[in-house]
Each structure stands twice: as C-alpha cells, then as structure tokens.
Amino acid sequence: MKFKKIAIIGKYPAAIESNEMDSQLIDLIEHLSKKDYELIIEEKTQKKIKITRYQATPLQNIGAEADIAIIVGGDGTMLGVARSLVDDGIPMIGVNSGRFGFLADLNKANMFVSIDQVLNGNYDEDKRLLIETKVYRDEKIIYESFALNDVVIKSGVRLIELEVSINDKFVHTQRSDGIIVSTPTGTTAYALSAGGPILHPQLEALSIVPINPHTLSNRPIAIDAISEIDIKIVQMEEASLSIDGQIKFPLDMRDKIQVTKAKRTISILHPKDYCYFEMLRNKLHWG
C-alpha cells in the first residue's frame, strides 16, 4: 500500500520535557517534508510545536483525511488515537516517548529508518481486535464505547459483588475489588498486574481477570473472543466502568455491562524486523 497523506499526532508524557518532544516532532516533520508526502498535523500538536505551514486537523477528522497516522507518544496516546480513528480504519505507526511502548514500539533513536521502511511498503500489518461495551439500565443502553486494551469494573472503597455470565451461561458470582475484561493487546497492561495471562495479539480470545478477589479460587480465565460476556452488579456501594484506563463512567445497582468483540479492528504497522517476543523480552526484562 502506498501512503500519500500522513497525519502526525504528538503527545507530551509527564516524563518527557516539552522542548525534547517539540524537537522530536519537528525533526520528524522536517524529515518527511523532504519526501513526496502530504502532511497533516493534528491541531493540538500544531499549536504546541508552532509549525503552521501544514494543514491542521482535529483528531476526530484525521481518519477521513489521512492514509496513515504516525503517533509520537506513549501507549496511552496510542489507545486514545485508536479509539478516535476506529471508524475510518487507517493504520498507525507508534513512536515511543513514554515508559513501556508495548503499542508505540518504534525507538525514537532510529525512528527515521523504521518509519521510512514502513512508508516504503516494507512492513508487517498487525491487526488488533477491539471490544465493544454497552451499559444497560432498565433494559436501555445508557452508555457504549470501544476499547483496545480493556474494560474494567471497579469498586470504590468496599468490595463489589458481580455476577458473570458467558453466552447466557452462569459462570460465577464474585466478591472483589472489581473485574477486568481484556483483549490480547490489553493483557500486558492492567490485567497483567492483576495476575492475568499474556495472550498473543493474534489470538481471537479475551481474558477475564478478577481484581483482588475475596475467594482465592477465583482465577483468571481465557475465552473465545466471539463470546458475549454479561456482568451484573449484585451488591455495591460505589463503582465505575473504565475504558482503556482513560474514560470513566459511574455505575448504578441496576446496571448490566455487556462486552463483545467489536466488528472493527485497528492496524498497527511494524518494520519487517519486528518481533513480538523480542519486544516482550525487552519490556518485561526477561532473561
């Protein structure tokens, strides 16, 4: 696939000095401007770096105007951008300026070489499944959203009691601090710290991971991604729903949360020498 219109999206993680990120984005823009590409700069990024000679576009419109998006930031930036671009389906390249870089996997030290490889067609396409979440209250949908990483139902200060069913089959009632429904992508995020398994991103599977369960026999389980997961609130004092750790929605005792595999996917492009297991080994400090 040939890419002509390239969108540049930047984010400023707290760990990165503003002038360092400015320089990184400006260098990337200057590098690409020497080639035969039409550049589009996400409008907040443009205001930050003060380069005005290129088209500025709101994030929500980039998918309709660009062929590909290059994101300079961390995994959180990738998550937010992915949800914004999901309807248009344009692929993404992630340059890591955050902490981990499970999604934004290109190293900023050699980003020009890696980006040029991808833009010249020397890449592997990594399609990631999304999950769709709907909150029902009195049998009406009151909230819905896509997630690339996970959906988390979490209590406030006290335990929450949840009833979990899969494909209309009762699984269990659990008392815990909450529950995580994770995509394979999300299994290296919150679900991993809660004791869940790592699922390869090409698996068509989801994981259900309890958070600090009261009964130690409540263990994480992995299920087919085409399953429908229904979670009912049995008892709570306060609780909320979190989408990718970025969107928070307050829950009520009457609510039922339904999680299913979304029909849409997102695509991350990697250079040909990318290896998922090498990435895990480096990020998780395996031997």
Segments the model singles out, each with a brief description of its role:
Residues H172-S217:
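Gly/Ser/Thr-rich active-site loops/lids in small-molecule metabolic enzymes
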Residues M1-I68, G80, A109-D126, V135-E144:
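ATP/NTP phosphate-donor binding region
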Residues I71-D75, A82-S84:
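N-terminal glycine-rich "phosphate-gripper" loop used for MgATP/nucleotide binding
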Residues P13-A14, D75-T77, G98-F100, T185-T187:
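Short glycine-rich anion-binding loops that position phosphate/pyrophosphate groups of nucleotides
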Residues F100-D177:
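Catalytic core of DAGKc-family lipid kinases
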Residues I8, I71, V181:
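Redox-cofactor binding/interface segments in oxidoreductases and associated redox assembly factors
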Residues D88-L106:
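Short, acidic/small-residue loops that bind anionic groups at enzyme active sites
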Residues I153, I166-F170, L216-G287:
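ATP/nucleoside-binding phosphotransfer catalytic cores, i.e., glycine-rich phosphate-binding loops
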